[in-house]
A protein has these predicted regions:
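Bacterial N-terminal signal peptides
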Residues: 10-20
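His/Glu-based metal-binding/catalytic segments typifying zinc-dependent metallopeptidases
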Residues: 58-62, 69-71, 249-308
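N- or domain-start disorder-to-order transition segments that initiate the globular core
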Residues: 28-64
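Bacterial N-terminal signal peptides that target proteins for export
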Residues: 2-11, 512
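M16/MPP (pitrilysin/insulinase) zinc-metallopeptidase core fold and M16-derived inactive scaffolds
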Residues: 67-129, 189-193, 305-321, 513
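Charge-rich, well-structured scaffold segments of protease-associated domains
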Residues: 4-8, 23-26, 48, 53-56, ...
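N-terminal mature ectodomain segment of secretory-pathway/periplasmic proteins
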Residues: 486-489, 493-534
């Protein structure tokens, strides 16, 4: 009994001590972050074939699957009056080989439950690891022996034209066309626009010439991830890919864009719009691996990288102008862009632009708080850590390191670089990459409701959906003193007056539609007794 009492006393003392320690913690302050740890990044192996093809292998035996991506590292291309032929050539790669028709190729891929896709710079294949050899053999056949027949070319062209037609009234597609053309210029690979006319001018020979010029092993890389062994992969690629012949590929050089001289408004009138698509930005030069990237990434999280950003909290949470407002930036060996964007109601378009400009200026001239910086860093580090759970991330790191000549420990030191970003760094990159007086404000919306109030932000220029300059749309305005009743009465007088309307006893409507599968048009007639208007 005495022992029990002593135990109770010791327990009470321990609890009191723990409570006292707990009570001393000031929970109004964020705990100090520990030093950034070096991430545990998975390993990869690399080998190179005699033809120059470089292959990166990430072994992961958790699941019996494998994925392969072949990347052709060519410079951007200016396609001119045949814009679209590069994309079409990439599509044709997956439409059969000289040894397999398209139907045969599709049948073999489907039988394995696999996936195969092609583009103008890549071939991707994935499936069960027991089919690894078959997938390598098919990938090799596609990249070395594309058929590119006239029949498949005609089909691809028809589908391409159909897609362009569907994008003509899509506000997002219109914005991509116009913003890109005005930021980079139409005589730049990133600014030219694919149209019906450019696609119609493409020939099968154009697509073949593209393939023959750029699909070369000495400028290509392959990443393989999954349940495979390096020794097996080496054997398969030597067997199936060694026949791919190397050749010299000419590089391209393009001048930097200089199209934006001062902040201005570019407006595309879309009369059916009930909301405006807004994009505000400027070109930037930021190559992969640049020392500014980490600070800029922290800055972008604070400004508009998500729901914690200034733009989101201002335009959505505070003003309720939109469901979300964000910002983003890109990296590119040539040139890229920074921009902020949202979709807002017509009635608040000018107010939204004002808030965008306010937040961009605040980012350039103000100083981010310690709490904002800590949250942004935590978000970036958390995303990075989660990405390491995917073996494909390791393959991506390997490819980027090779493609952009990054230091071998670039990703190993990533968290340390993010942790080292300061408030001064954030302000410096904000001023460097967000233009204060050379912003392009691009809006796709209903000109009648939106355009007249935008002149205060800069000179307004009007464009069609392909970034061609147009005249300002005519805005109908109600003459002073005219009411809705005046308009209705004017219409009634124009058709004969109240006496004529009163004599109408019935009316009918006839509607006709043609539908696939019906032997004849569908006709509907509706007759109604006229209402007593007076």
């Amino acid at each position: 009994m005495i022992i029990m009492k002593k135990s109770i006393i010791f327990l009470q003392i321990a609890l009191f001590a723990a409570f006292a320690t707990f009570a001393q913690v000031d929970r109004s302050k964020r705990p100090e972050a520990g030093a950034a740890r070096a991430p545990e990044i998975g390993k990869y192996e690399m080998f190179e074939l005699s033809n120059g093809l470089k292959v990166f292998v990430v072994e992961n035996h958790k699941l019996p699957r494998v994925s392969m991506s072949l990347i052709v590292d060519r410079d951007p291309m200016l396609e001119g009056t045949k814009a679209g032929y590069v994309q079409m050539a990439g599509d044709l790669l997956g439409r059969g080989t000289t040894t397999r028709s398209k139907d045969k190729l599709d049948e073999e891929v489907d039988f394995m439950g696999a996936n195969l896709s092609t583009s103008s710079t890549s071939i991707n294949a994935s499936g069960l690891s027991k089919y690894t050899e078959k997938l390598v053999e098919i990938m090799a056949d596609v990249v070395i022996n594309p058929a590119m027949t006239q029949v498949e070319f005609d089909k691809a062209k028809e589908q391409f034209l159909s897609g362009i037609e569907g994008e003509k009234d899509d506000a997002g597609s219109i914005m991509n066309n116009v913003f890109g053309a005005l930021i980079y210029g139409k005589n730049h690979p990133y600014g030219e626009i694919i149209t019906k006319e450019t696609v119609e001018s493409i020939t099968l020979e154009d697509c073949k010439n593209y393939y023959n010029t750029y699909f070369k092993p000495n400028i290509s890389y392959v990443a393989i991830v999954g349940d495979v062994k390096l020794k097996t992969v080496k054997k398969l690629f030597k067997k199936y890919m060694s026949a791919w012949k190397p050749a010299e590929v000419k590089g391209e050089v393009y001048p930097l864009p200089t199209s934006i001289q001062k902040t201005a408004v570019a407006f595309v009138d879309r009369p059916s719009s009930v909301q405006s698509v807004i994009r505000i930005g400027n070109p930037i030069v930021l190559k992969p691996g640049d020392a500014d990237i980490d600070a800029l990434r922290v800055m972008n999280i604070i400004l508009g990288g998500g729901s914690m950003g200034h733009l989101y909290n201002n335009l959505r949470e505070d003003k309720a102008y939109t469901y979300g407002a964000y910002s983003t930036f890109g990296t590119d060996e040539l040139v890229s862009v920074f921009y902020a964007y949202a979709q807002v109601r017509n009635a608040v378009t000018d107010s939204a632009v004002q808030e965008f400009l306010f937040e961009l200026d605040r980012m350039r001239t103000g100083e981010a708080s310690a709490d904002e910086i800590a949250q942004a860093k935590a978000s970036i580090m958390g995303s990075f850590g989660r990405s390491l759970e995917q073996p494909s991330t390791i393959a991506g790191f390997a490819l980027n390191t090779a493609l952009y000549n990054l230091p071998a420990d670039y990703y190993q030191n990533y968290l340390k670089r993010v942790e080292a970003v300061t408030a001064a760094d954030i302000q410096r990159v904000s001023q460097k990459y967000i233009s204060g007086d050379k912003l392009l404000i691009t809006i796709v919306g209903k000109g009648q409701d939106v355009a007249p109030s935008l002149g205060r932000f800069g000179d307004i220029a009007y464009y069609d959906i392909y970034a061609n300059p147009t005249e300002a749309p005519s805005f109908l305005t109600m003459p002073e003193g005219v009411t809705a009743n005046d308009v209705i009465n004017g219409y009634i007088n124009a058709i004969g007056g109240k006496e004529a309307v009163a004599k109408i006893t019935a009316y009918s409507m006839k509607m006709e539609a043609t539908m696939a599968g019906l032997p004849a048009p569908l006709i509907m007639t509706i007759s109604k007794r006229a209402p007593d208007y007076y």
